[in-house]
Amino acid sequence: MTLFIDGDALPNILKPILLRSVERLKIPTKVIANKKIHIGDSPCIEMIIVSQGADRADDMIIELLSPEDLVITADIPLADRVITAGGHAIDHRGTRYSSDNIKHYLAMRNLFESIRESGEITNGPKPFTQKDAHAFANQLSAFLQRLEKRKK
């Protein structure tokens, strides 16, 4: 399994959580973004910088993705592509996307995007909190534990 990190909007508070997990389990990790994102120093982490442009990082992740790989992303359309390709996706707030729930999240995202574009909603997502980081750490840990059990 490879861990892919969609680095474009990764909260800094998650970097040490990811680094500890990657180092502890020696998980091959690819951070993909249109600029350098420093997660930490580890031989397990590879930084891939893509050119500027819509969906360039997303396209690279999908190109490199194998079934059973895990993608960390806040991008719901990317999560949908990952699930369709047989991968797994977790967002920064600890939501684990699956074939059972991704279409619901995608529909809600599209609805709110339409409402924002019409000017009815002007605020963005709520601020990222320590509670969100804790939920993310728990979801990542649970996923990696299930993976380790399958290896045995």
UniProtKB/Swiss-Prot annotation:
Signal peptide: none
Coiled-coil segments on the chain, per record: none
NCBIfam families referenced in this protein's UniProt entry, alphabetically: PRK00124.1
Protein family membership: Belongs to the UPF0178 family.
Protein name: UPF0178 protein NIS_0137
Provenance organism: Nitratiruptor sp. (strain SB155-2)
